[in-house]
Swiss-Prot record:
Gene for this chain: smpB
Protein source organism: Fervidobacterium nodosum (strain ATCC 35602 / DSM 5306 / Rt17-B1)
Localization per record: Cytoplasm
SUPFAM superfamilies named among the record's database cross-references: Small protein B (SmpB) (SSF74982)
Protein name: SsrA-binding protein
InterPro entries in alphabetical order: SmpB, SsrA-bd_prot, SsrA-bd_prot_CS
């Protein structure tokens, strides 16, 4: 498994509830561009539309050696999941405050591009501050134990 890009903001801004591995429908120049340049998750999210899941605002840069048939960098991309998984995601999305975000995009062992998506709930600012405080105290305890043995 070769990771192309990860969504680092997902773990700081959201509480991750469930994760799913999904295939993604791409054109040839997008795959070539992913191999060369990677992707950007800035403001990307998923939406369920007519029984299908679509990934929106995932930026895949244009392929440098492409011609006039190069892809649109911000186009909506269809995700491939089983119907039961889509229904489970849709039932969670009906609840207040839940959203579906991409967390990782990677090549699996067969060379196929996969996207890890997560059902997440947004964190409040005080939740983020509490998490930062916990990390700092854990770091201080670790340093204290390291130097005072």
């Amino acid at each position: 498994m070769r990771i192309i890009a990860t969504n680092k903001k997902a773990y700081t801004d959201y509480i991750i509830d469930e994760t799913y591995e999904a295939g993604i429908v791409l054109v040839g120049t997008e795959v070539k561009s992913l191999r060369e340049h990677g992707a950007s998750f800035k403001d990307s999210f998923c939406r369920v539309k007519e029984g299908e899941i679509w990934l929106l605002n995932l930026h895949i840069p244009p392929y440098q050696h492409g011609n006039i048939y190069n892809h649109d960098p911000e186009r909506p991309r269809k995700l491939l999941l089983h119907k039961k998984e889509i229904d489970r995601i849709w039932s969670k999305l009906k609840l207040e405050g839940y959203t579906v975000i991409p967390t990782k995009i990677y090549f699996n062992n067969q060379g196929k591009v996969k996207v890890e998506i997560a059902i997440a709930k947004g964190k409040k600012s005080y939740d983020k501050r509490e998490e930062i405080k916990k990390k700092e105290t854990q770091k201080r305890i670790k340093e204290y134990l390291k130097y005072n043995r």
